[in-house]
Every structure is written in structure tokens, then in C-alpha cells.
């Protein structure tokens, strides 16, 4: 206050004012400071000072022809004095107002297209809803977040090539547009920006915003998707938060969210198959997310999540070097350890073989709702500083850290046997056994941990075994802090290896990820996920398995038909029939299979009994290992819609209904596709197999390879011989005629010859 009075006093003297306004600044150091380099040293002062002048703006000389000297109010818009040191005109801010109101209007059609990201943002904010402001302590942790909603996921190099091609198509320089997304975007943008008058540089900048993911390491307390980050300044302060619901979606957030769901589903499914790694790759390659191949998204998308990283590792991509345990991401910040196998006894005297980490290490632990700093020595927790959203989240972090510490008192706190299994019914490894055990109930663990007196430290409190805070006492080594622990900021990626059981290791052999770490949380994807792999048919339940199995048979009928007659065992072992088995009651699977296989064999043996519809209907039942029995069935049961439903061996049922006139197949009332029966199959006359342009030589001859379908015959050269499958599931040897003139006679001779060849 005194200082202000003193200053006021000084300013009231005219001499002070004169010194401050008239004296030149001639101290070289000061002049240097404010004039060297292009960077403005005091932007706000500069702005205020400029705006206090009459003509703070300079413009090209042409302005004098386009803007009048005075506006309607008679105010001067530009000065006749030219700008010192350039041939530009000095202009008043009023000229800008005049121009905005009265200047020429250009074609605005390109503005929403070029400035798409801004227009979209306005729409999102217009439709977003802001809720009440709450005052409370904000636990913010720095996370790497996407700050640029609505972008495609191109790499900087890919985007650069697209931008050059769109904005400067005639510039020299090799541009290689290879990826699907590059080509699509280039084509789209070239069409949109035809005859665009906006400066090319501006267009290039705006395109970059649209094409490339920009990330920043920012303190965040709430949602981390880009739609929340764009309003970060409105939704969280140091001591307040404002609720916000975004208006609309942005493609990149939807891709990230759907990718995580797809990856989790795929890893969970692969883990229970016979060869997890091969299955995982097959599924990643055959899945699409929002119409884009999942493998393409994985290559471009930097999302770090356990399941996503397992998929990336399987594809040979680099991933972050941090590891995952109990749903927390651990990053070692100092220290080192060596691993040694050790046998320990639980409180129930069960022997566990654990890999002990010997040595002092420090880690940061970052989870969805809690973060911590952990310092540990060999089988001893030295200190854990944890912060989280609520008591529950803090407890989760403490349990994970206690198990990770491998302390003896933790192992002795186990009550009862440890026999947790994964989805494939295999026992979990000891560390995950312990984790699951204490996640179910940590009472004994916390009670046995031990308690200590604590000194009061700013921003830290103790926590008792029942999770109540205390300033006097705390569980040994454990404190709760008001401050969050920042996520690991580096974007460094390392080369990793993955084994058959989807365990991901770094170059030193440390396990970074395993299927046990994949979250069980279910969510609804925002973009359509299309799993083409039969392994994922069961994700939408039994009905989906049923429909998909039959659709697959119909789509591949030409090849299925050949295998049915030539190599049935190979057909029965196809993985596409695997999901179907879960629908057939376990006790009777084998009998059904034996019955159907026998029936099929009779069809192969007895001329004229081949029945497309029946083969399709019964084929999935033949895939189970058959039990030989004399049982005959008139209907087969499948478990769908919560109960057993019947498929009739002869004739239609609600489950499997084939309409002969429309040739449509419906499964449980859902359309499953059109079935093309072999011509004249109903009359089972040999004429259905008449092959115009081919001479029938006799019975099948294995030397000429596997049987072709009638459609494949067209590829034969004249005079070439081949085995061919004809309407009744019979195979004959044919030769393509050398002359076309004799085609007419084929119909007469074929009938006789087929009869001879078969009998």
C-alpha cells in the first residue's frame, strides 16, 4: 500500500511524467534485450502500446483504393504518412471494421471445408451441456492426451505426402501414397478444394490438424478423450471442476474406444483356443473397425492399453517399455534387480514358486482411478505413496503394491487354497493367484501388515487397515497423498517378443504383459466392429453362432460340396464348426455326430440320394468326435434362446427353414442367404450333370487331381482332362473337347456315359 501511495505521489509531479515520456532509452543492454531476435519480449505490453496508437496496423498500398479515407462517422481509416522503413500504409483498426461490414464478399463455400476442425468444434460446444461447478481438491496427474479432436491417424510422413499432393500437386518431389487411407483422403480433399482461394499455406496447416494426432503431456483429473481435452480449461481448475457432456462424437475417440473393446474381445477369445498366438493374429487380420482393417488401425494408433499392446506385439510392432500388473502400469524410475526362483509357503502351507526380484527399485504405478510411487527392496515394501479418487481406488492400488512387493507377511496372510484359473481353465501363475486372492478379500492382508507411528508431512496422511485416514498412525510404509503421480511421459517404444500363450517380454526377458492383465470390463463399441473370424461368432451369443455357421456353409458351398464327397474328415475338422459344438448338448454330441456321418456315407454310396439342404442342415453336427451307436434321430437339439430347440432331420423347423420356391434359408426367422441347389436335384436325374463341351471318359481317376466344381471347369484348356463333381455328389473324369462343333451331341452321349461311369 505504501509503495502505491509513493508511486501516486511521484506521478503527480510533472517532472516525473516528463522523464518517463520524453527521456530516450539509450542503455545498450536494454535496447539489445528488446530488439534482438524476432521473438516479441513483452507481447501484452506491445499489444497495449500498439492499440493506443492511432494507426497500429500496416497494409499494402492497394488498401487506399479499396477502403475510403474516412468512414460514415468521418473517422480517418488510414494515414497519408507511409510507414517508416517500408512502402506500406499505416492503418487504423477502424478500417478493419469497415472492411468487415462493407468489403467485397468472396465465395465462402470452401471455408467450412478448410476450417472443418473449427466448425466441428463450434457444433460440439453448441450441443454440449455444461453442468454445475463443484469446488473440491483436484487430483490431477499429467497424462499424454490427444489434443486434436476429429483427426485421422496418419503418421507425420504420410500426412506430409497427402498435404503436398492436395495443396501443391505440381511441386517437384517424390510422393508415395500407399495406404488405403492416404488415397481416400487425397481423392476426397482434391474434390472438396477445387478452385479454393484460401492461401495454400493455411490450407496445409488446417489439413495437418485433420490428419495427424497431436498429443501433449497435460495435467488431467477427468476424461482423457480428445473431446474432453478441448474444453479442459472450462472443466477443471486447481480447486474446482465443471461437469461437461460433449455434444456429438469425433471419429478418433470412437476409434480409440472401439479398438480397445475389439482388442480385449480378441485377446480373451484367443487365450482359450488351442494356439492363442495364431488365433489372435487370424482374428486381428480378419476384423474391421468402422470399415477400416484392424491391423491398419493398430499400425497407426498410439493407444496404450493392455489388450491393444498384446495385439501390437503379436504383429511385431514396438510398444511402450512399461509393464502391467493388476491393471496398473508400472514404470521403473530407478534401481535394478535380478530375478531368482524361490519357493515360499502360504498361510495355508501351500508351496508357491515365485520369481523374486532381488535389489532396490523405484516405480511409478498409474491406474485408471489411482496412482502411486512405490519404493521396494528384495521382498520388502519400503514406501508406497498413493493417491486416488476414492477409498476403493486407493485400496486397489495398495493391494497391488503389497502383492508386487512379494513380502512374507503378504504370503502368510493367504487363507485357504489358491486355485484360480484363467478362461482356458489353466491355473494362473503364483503372482496372479495371490493378486486374485487378495482382490477378493484383503482384510487379513491389511490386518497382518503392521502399523507404525507417523510424522506429519504436508499433504500426506496415514491410512489404517480399515482404510480410514489418520494423522497419527498408518500401515507400515504406506501414505496417502493429495498429489497424483504423473503418467510416464516418454513416447519411446521398444522391440518386444511374444510367446504362444500371448506373454509379451522385453529384450531382457521381463514379462511386460499377459492375458491375465486384460480387463474384464465389457463396453459397447461406438463404431461397428465386424469380426469375420469364426472364433468371434459366439461374442453375440448362441443365435449368432447358429446363423454364422450356416451362412459360412452357404457362402463356401462350392468348396464344401467337393470336400464333402472327397475328403469329409478334413471338412469335419474345419475350425468354422468349432463354435457350433457349444450349442449341442454335451451328453449327446458324439451320438449325433456318428448318426450324421453314417447318413452322409449312405448319400455318397447310393446314387440319387444327394440332398443339398439336408447336407447343409446336418453338417455342423458331424464335426464333433463321433460315437458309434445304432441310434437313429428324427430331430437334433440345439441350445439357443435359453432352451433346447429342435432341428428336424427331414423337413423344416423354426430353427432351420428352407423355402424351396424362393430358395431362401432362414435361421430362427433371420435370413441366412440364398441356397443354389444343384439343377434338377429334386428329380435326381443324371441329366443334371450334362456337361456341354466336355467328353465324359469314365470313372474318377485320382491321377488328375482333386475334383473340380462345374464352375471351375471353364478354366481347362482344350484337350485337358480333369475329375469333376456332378450333381449327385459323384465324381467322373472328363476331357474338354478340342472342337466346338460337337457340343450338340454331348447331351445325348453324356447321359449314357455317366450311367456307365457310375455303375
UniProtKB/Swiss-Prot annotation:
The record marks 627 as: Mammalian adaptation. Pfam families: Flu_PB2_1st, Flu_PB2_2nd, Flu_PB2_3rd, Flu_PB2_4th, Flu_PB2_5th, Flu_PB2_6th, Flu_PB2_7th. Keywords: Cap snatching, Eukaryotic host gene expression shutoff by virus, Eukaryotic host transcription shutoff by virus, Host gene expression shutoff by virus, Host mitochondrion, Host nucleus, Host-virus interaction, Inhibition of host innate immune response by virus, Inhibition of host MAVS by virus, Inhibition of host RLR pathway by virus, Inhibition of host RNA polymerase II by virus, mRNA capping, mRNA processing, Viral immunoevasion, Viral transcription, Virion. The gene is PB2. It is found in: Virion; Host nucleus; Host mitochondrion. One of its GO terms (biological process) is cap snatching. Belongs to the influenza viruses PB2 family. One of its GO terms (cellular component) is host cell nucleus. A motif (Nuclear localization signal) lies at residues 736-739. One of its GO terms (molecular function) is RNA binding. InterPro entries: Flu_PB2_2nd (IPR049110), Flu_PB2_6th (IPR049114), Flu_PB2_C (IPR049115), Flu_PB2_CAP-bd (IPR048298), Flu_PB2_middle (IPR049111), Flu_PB2_N (IPR049106), INV_PB2 (IPR001591), PB2_helical (IPR049113). Influenza RNA polymerase is composed of three subunits: PB1, PB2 and PA. Interacts (via N-terminus) with PB1 (via C-terminus). Interacts with nucleoprotein NP (via N-terminus). Interacts (via N-terminus) with host MAVS (via N-terminus); this interaction inhibits host innate immune response. Its main location: virion. It comes from Influenza A virus (strain A/Memphis/4/1980 H3N2). Coiled coil: none annotated. SUPFAM superfamilies: PB2 C-terminal domain-like (SSF160453). Plays an essential role in transcription initiation and cap-stealing mechanism, in which cellular capped pre-mRNAs are used to generate primers for viral transcription. Recognizes and binds the 7-methylguanosine-containing cap of the target pre-RNA which is subsequently cleaved after 10-13 nucleotides by the viral protein PA. Plays a role in the initiation of the viral genome replication and modulates the activity of the ribonucleoprotein (RNP) complex. This is Polymerase basic protein 2.
Amino acid at each position: 500500500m505504501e509503495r502505491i501511495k509513493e508511486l501516486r505521489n511521484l506521478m503527480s509531479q510533472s517532472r516525473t511524467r516528463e522523464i518517463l515520456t520524453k527521456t530516450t532509452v539509450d542503455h545498450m543492454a536494454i535496447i539489445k534485450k528488446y530488439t534482438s531476435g524476432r521473438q516479441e519480449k513483452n507481447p501484452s505490453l506491445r499489444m497495449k502500446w500498439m492499440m493506443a496508437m492511432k494507426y497500429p496496423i500496416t497494409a499494402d498500398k492497394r488498401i487506399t483504393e479499396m477502403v475510403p479515407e474516412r468512414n460514415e462517422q468521418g473517422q480517418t481509416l488510414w494515414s497519408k504518412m507511409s510507414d517508416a522503413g517500408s512502402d506500406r500504409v499505416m492503418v487504423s483498426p477502424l478500417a478493419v471494421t469497415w472492411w468487415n461490414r462493407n468489403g467485397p464478399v468472396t465465395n465462402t463455400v470452401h471455408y467450412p471445408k478448410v476450417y472443418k476442425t473449427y466448425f466441428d468444434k463450434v457444433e460440439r460446444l453448441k450441443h454440449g451441456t455444461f453442468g454445475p461447478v463443484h469446488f473440491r481438491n483436484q487430483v490431477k496427474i499429467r497424462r499424454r492426451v490427444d489434443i486434436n479432436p476429429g483427426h485421422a491417424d496418419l503418421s507425420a510422413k504420410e500426412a506430409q505426402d497427402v498435404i503436398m499432393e492436395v495443396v501443391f500437386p505440381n511441386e517437384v518431389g517424390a510422393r508415395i501414397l500407399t495406404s488405403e487411407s492416404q488415397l481416400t483422403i487425397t481423392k476426397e480433399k482434391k474434390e472438396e478444394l477445387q478452385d479454393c482461394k484460401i492461401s495454400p499455406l493455411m490450407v496445409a496447416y488446417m489439413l495437418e490438424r485433420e490428419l495427424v494426432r497431436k498429443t501433449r503431456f497435460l495435467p488431467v483429473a477427468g476424461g482423457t478423450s480428445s473431446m474432453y481435452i478441448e474444453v479442459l480449461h472450462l472443466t477443471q481448475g486447481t480447486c474446482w471442476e465443471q461437469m461437461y457432456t460433449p455434444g456429438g462424437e469425433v471419429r478418433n475417440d470412437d476409434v480409440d474406444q472401439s479398438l480397445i473393446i475389439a482388442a480385449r474381445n480378441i485377446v480373451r477369445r484367443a487365450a482359450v483356443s488351442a494356439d492363442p498366438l495364431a488365433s489372435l493374429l487370424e482374428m486381428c487380420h480378419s476384423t474391421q473397425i468402422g470399415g477400416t482393417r484392424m491391423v491398419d488401425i493398430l499400425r497407426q494408433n498410439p493407444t496404450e492399453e493392455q489388450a491393444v499392446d498384446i495385439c501390437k506385439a503379436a504383429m511385431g510392432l514396438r510398444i511402450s517399455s512399461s509393464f502391467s500388473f493388476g491393471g496398473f502400469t508400472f514404470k521403473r524410475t530407478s534401481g535394478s534387480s535380478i530375478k531368482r526362483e524361490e519357493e515360499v509357503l502360504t498361510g495355508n502351507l501351500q508351496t508357491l514358486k515365485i520369481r523374486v526380484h532381488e535389489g532396490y527399485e523405484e516405480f511409478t504405478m498409474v491406474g485408471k482411478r489411482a496412482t502411486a510411487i512405490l519404493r521396494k527392496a528384495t521382498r520388502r515394501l519400503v514406501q508406497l505413496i498413493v493417491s486416488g479418487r476414492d477409498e476403493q481406488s486407493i485400496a486397489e492400488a495398495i493391494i497391488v503394491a503389497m502383492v508386487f512387493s512379494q513380502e512374507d507377511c503378504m504370503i502368510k496372510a493367504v487363507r485357504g487354497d489358491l486355485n484360480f484359473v484363467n478362461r482356458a481353465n489353466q491355473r494362473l501363475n503364483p503372482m496372479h493367484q495371490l493378486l486374485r486372492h487378495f482382490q477378493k478379500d484383503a482384510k487379513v492382508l491389511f490386518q497382518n501388515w503392521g502399523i507404525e507411528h507417523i510424522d506429519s508431512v504436508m499433504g500426506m496422511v496415514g491410512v489404517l487397515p480399515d482404510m480410514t485416514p489418520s494423522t497419527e498412525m498408518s500401515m507400515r510404509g504406506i501414505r496417502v497423498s493429495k498429489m497424483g503421480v504423473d503418467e510416464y511421459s516418454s513416447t519411446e517404444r521398444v522391440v518386444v517378443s511374444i510367446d504362444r500363450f500371448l506373454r509379451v517380454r522385453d529384450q531382457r526377458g521381463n514379462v511386460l504383459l499377459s492375458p491375465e492383465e486384460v480387463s474384464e470390463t465389457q463396453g459397447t463399441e461406438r463404431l461397428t466392429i465386424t469380426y469375420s473370424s469364426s472364433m468371434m461368432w459366439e461374442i453375440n451369443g448362441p443365435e449368432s453362432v447358429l446363423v454364422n455357421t450356416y451362412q459360412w456353409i452357404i457362402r463356401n458351398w462350392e468348396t464344401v460340396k467337393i470336400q464333402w464327397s472327397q475328403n469329409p474328415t478334413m471338412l469335419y475338422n474345419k475350425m468354422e464348426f468349432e463354435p457350433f459344438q457349444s450349442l449341442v448338448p454335451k451328453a449327446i454330441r458324439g451320438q449325433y455326430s456318428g448318426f450324421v456321418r453314417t447318413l452322409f456315407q449312405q448319400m455318397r454310396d447310393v446314387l440319387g440320394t444327394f440332398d443339398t439342404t439336408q447336407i447343409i442342415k446336418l453338417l455342423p453336427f458331424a464335426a464333433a468326435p463321433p460315437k458309434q451307436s445304432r441310434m437313429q434321430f428324427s430331430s437334433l437339439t440345439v441350445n439357443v434362446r435359453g432352451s433346447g430347440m429342435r432341428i428336424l432331420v427331414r423337413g423344416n423347423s423354426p430353427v432351420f427353414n428352407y423355402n424351396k420356391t424362393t430358395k431362401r434359408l432362414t435361421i430362427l426367422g433371420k435370413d441366412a442367404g440364398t441356397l443354389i441347389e444343384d439343377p434338377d436335384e429334386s428329380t435326381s436325374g443324371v441329366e443334371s450333370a450334362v456337361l456341354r463341351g466336355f467328353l465324359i471318359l469314365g470313372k474318377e481317376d485320382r491321377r488328375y487331381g482333386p475334383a473340380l466344381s462345374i464352375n471351375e471347369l471353364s478354366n481347362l484348356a482344350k484337350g485337358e482332362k480333369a475329375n469333376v463333381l456332378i450333381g449327385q455328389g459323384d465324381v467322373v473324369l472328363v476331357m474338354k473337347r478340342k472342337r466346338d462343333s460337337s457340343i450338340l451331341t454331348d447331351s445325348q452321349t453324356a447321359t449314357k456315359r455317366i450311367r456307365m461311369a457310375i455303375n
